[in-house]
């Protein structure tokens, strides 16, 4: 059966502009199924026996870019150092497997860590592969560790997952711990702006979102959230925060998780996803809407969007509902590219203005006796003068 004019139009748009998905948990499926050993597993990576993602279906879906989630679960004992350090260790393992996956399949995937590299990957016919982490429990309470993750290619950090942490409150946990952001969290927003890391507000409490939206100098994203007015779920974005997101110039990337789309989750469909996109676009402008599936973070996608091969159906559905080509292109990927460009610009401005980095608060390393010995030795050498 030949494609309809709308389907042909959708395919054309997908070849003109990268459709960039804000969140996919395929790396965690690799951890669960292969224990991260992908040596000799190319056949399975092309056609996975589980989940909504594999290389074959990515190509069929004409995906232009993907933020792969280096997700690890919240520690069972978050207040204990061993749990915090284990989360950081697992995060490094997930970053490693993402990089190995990209390196192993260079004809399909290409690493990207900037707006410019998204375009170069797309023009080369590859899926631009970016990385995000899903919760500040993954940094072992260390801003130094977070900066190193940025150097390893991480370009967004979700402030929380389904647990409170030292920086922010989560959406689905009660009672609240900080009333939104902690003081450390407020300082971290500034540091994330300075280092050029996108701030992701998915999974955070409504109060944390409000505070971060007011504090951040750079646009923020919701990498995988939907609209509270259409589905009253703690993970979704309220109209009040949508208004602040508009002022912030950020993007809400609509999630495909059934529970976030419809009160009767088992009845969620492609049409519900389009409803959420159109609501946000009508409310705050299509310049502030994107796509963040959360594929492989769910057991089953909505009807009509069952896996990563279905992006053409989503684009066609938006066109059928009367969304203009220009607005569809914005939703597909131009908006999140613009946010990344602005995040990069703000970071360059802050660093250029001499903004100092936020440092970890370390325990005392030396006692006063050792400091005095070191000082005396330095003074002794000074008194000796230049040596021939």
From Swiss-Prot:
Disulfide bonds join 74-163. Pathway: Mycotoxin biosynthesis. Substrate binds at residues 161, 235, 294. One of its GO terms (molecular function) is metal ion binding. SUPFAM superfamilies: Metallo-dependent hydrolases. It is an enzyme of class 3 (hydrolase). CDD domains: rDP_like. Belongs to the metallo-dependent hydrolases superfamily. Peptidase M19 family. Dipeptidase; part of the gene cluster that mediates the biosynthesis of gliotoxin, a member of the epipolythiodioxopiperazine (ETP) class of toxins characterized by a disulfide bridged cyclic dipeptide. The first step in gliotoxin biosynthesis is the condensation of serine and phenylalanine to form the cyclo-L-phenylalanyl-L-serine diketopiperazine (DKP) by the NRPS gliP. GliP is also able to produce the DKP cyclo-L-tryptophanyl-L-serine, suggesting that the substrate specificity of the first adenylation (A) domain in gliP is sufficiently relaxed to accommodate both L-Phe and L-Trp. This is Dipeptidase gliJ. The gene is gliJ.
